[in-house]
Amino acid sequence: MGKIIKWILRSALSLLALVVVGVAYLVLAVDPNDFKPEIKSAAASQDVELTLDGNLSWQFLPQIGVVVEQVEFAHGSIASGKIGELSLSVSWSELFNIDLSGKQLPVGSIAINDATILLAELAPNTFPVQLKRFNARVNNFSLTGDRFSITASAHVFSGLALELEALLRLQMNTNTGVIEQITVSDLEASIDGMELSGQLNAENNFAIAQGSLRSNHFDLQQLVKTIGMSFPLVKLPEMASKDALTAVSWNSSFNTDMNGLSTFNTQLDIDSQIINIASKVDHSIHNLYMRVSGNQFDMTHYLAADSNS
């Protein structure tokens, strides 16, 4: 992840440097397409294979920048994809304050439109995830701890709609690619009827993290059916009540230390029945402790449809 951000930083600086040149020559004397080899070289230095089959053009309103069409990329076995249109821009007021030393990205915007992205392995022993019709916009992007916003949408699996928006603060060492600190606030996301909100604060490449995440009441049956369209083995049995698992919500908080003790506390609301789950992970000895508690839980609605007991 750090290498990808580092590559985006350097590539963005290279492209935004073209903006300065373009303004100096009133844009007419410079064709940004002539700089494709330099952009590919900057990507290759970060182990990213880049193909630029489309046109590069200037953008003037509402901000000045560069628009790149038909981008293909591959970053080893981590991610690959195609981007219909990528734009990098900077506000007019910040245009002449750009630091071209590579240490800081100027205040500006990054927009990705109509992309297809394959995430090969989000975590060990997981399956690839493909994001289709991926669109995203980042405003006032910064790697020095200043706050910026992000909005994104995509379709995953068989049309499962994802939407996300949040405010972030990101402090990254651009020399090593290490994320020293990241703060996510005002997180709002939706996944096919399930709405999520929360916040996160992490340090040292997520070695230490604290945060919380909660959902609305959503129809778990419908969500599993949608996922099952792509993964037939993912399905729920027919239960005694057709309303079982149609009003589910959860509220979770966590405090993790990958070199010490991590704690997770979750309250599940399953059709108005409350279950509390408290767990601890001792990473030093690879032990998991878990306690599940609740006043009572009526199982009659969740038994097999033909069960008489």
Positions of predicted regions on the chain:
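Solvent-exposed beta-strand/coil patches in large extracellular/periplasmic or lumenal scaffold regions
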Residues: G102, F134-S153, T183-D186, M239-Q267, ...
